[in-house]
């Protein structure tokens, strides 16, 4: 089940990505159609049908027959999108905005600012800022730097990918703390051993992944795990300008665990409790 179901008052079943069609957009300004692979089972609706029915019941009528009608409405509201028609995208077509004309002569814009930037002098503008030291400080008690990172395999909080046996075979709970071989030797930690990672905010158990990949003094952890949840460690130190949390710099301590057998059982028990709680929530 999805962890967000625990917070929901109403759950409306919708089609998955392979059960409907529409248009994808990406950070490269591209639009591309995608197509339904299989017919949905049971009493499901697409997201746009659900949103339309909710809006209509709340006094804002929304009536569409298909996704093309929705897309046509959207592109006519934005001049840069107007030329990106369903027909022009075709089966495997790919249109990058600006695409302002519906004629075939306008095939979109592969990259912006080909001749000059949209500034008074036609040049790009770069801004610098002064370096500011991290708010969290290393001490004898917390001598290592934790950075939260991403890795291939699982997505976000694993509410979906965590149910895939193939991905679980690649990596599973309680996740990993990547540390340098020199740090591992100094701390008496072996590869794949369970360890405690502590910060000023909290403490979690996870599995050591020892290699030369991390820098000495650094600890890298992904945020997908429920047991080895690195977000339990990071503090909410915010940048005064962007308000971005200082998740890439957190002072921590890594400790070996003498009784590995008991630690393994602890992880199994805690994981079972979490899954049981999610299962009960999903069942209502």
What is each model feature region?
Residues 1-4:
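Short, small-residue-biased leader/transition segments that mark boundaries at the very start
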Residues 7:
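Short gly/Ser/Thr-rich phosphate-binding loop of adenylate-forming enzymes
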Residues 13-15, 19, 29-40, 163:
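Short beta-alpha connecting loops at secondary-structure transitions
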Residues 14, 52, 119-121, 127-128, ...:
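Pocket-edge structural micro-motifs
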Residues 18, 60, 132, 150-152, ...:
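Short loop/turn segments at secondary-structure transitions that flank enzyme active sites
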Residues 41-43, 47-95, 162-178, 182-284:
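Long, contiguous, secondary-structure-rich segments that constitute the structural scaffold
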Residues 68-166:
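Long, low-complexity segments enriched in small/aliphatic residues
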């Amino acid at each position: 089940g999805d962890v967000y179901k625990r917070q929901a008052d109403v759950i409306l079943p919708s089609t998955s990505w392979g059960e409907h069609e529409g248009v994808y957009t990406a950070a490269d300004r591209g639009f591309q159609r995608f197509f339904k692979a299989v017919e949905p089972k049971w009493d499901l609706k697409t997201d746009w049908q659900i949103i339309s029915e909710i809006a209509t019941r709340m006094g804002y009528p929304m009536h569409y027959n298909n996704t093309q009608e929705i897309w046509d409405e959207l592109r006519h509201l934005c001049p840069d999108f107007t030329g990106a028609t369903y027909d022009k995208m075709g089966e495997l077509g790919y249109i990058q905005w600006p695409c302002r004309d519906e004629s075939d002569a306008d095939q979109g814009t592969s990259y912006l600012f080909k001749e000059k930037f949209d500034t008074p002098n036609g040049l790009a503008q770069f801004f610098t800022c002064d370096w500011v030291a991290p708010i969290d400080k290393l001490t004898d008690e917390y001598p290592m730097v934790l950075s939260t990172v991403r890795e291939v395999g699982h997505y976000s909080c694993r509410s979906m990918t965590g149910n895939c046996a193939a991905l679980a075979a690649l990596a599973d709970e309680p996740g990993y703390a990547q540390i340098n071989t020199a740090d591992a030797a100094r701390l008496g930690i072996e590869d794949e051993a369970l360890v405690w990672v502590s910060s000023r905010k909290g403490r979690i158990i996870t599995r050591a992944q020892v290699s030369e990949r991390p820098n000495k003094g650094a600890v890298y952890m992904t945020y997908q795990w429920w047991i080895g949840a690195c977000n339990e460690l990071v503090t909410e130190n915010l940048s005064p300008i962007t308000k971005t949390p200082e998740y890439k710099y957190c002072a921590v301590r890594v400790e070996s665990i003498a009784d590995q057998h008991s630690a393994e059982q602890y992880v199994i028990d805690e994981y079972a409790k979490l899954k049981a709680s999610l299962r009960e929530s999903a069942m209502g």
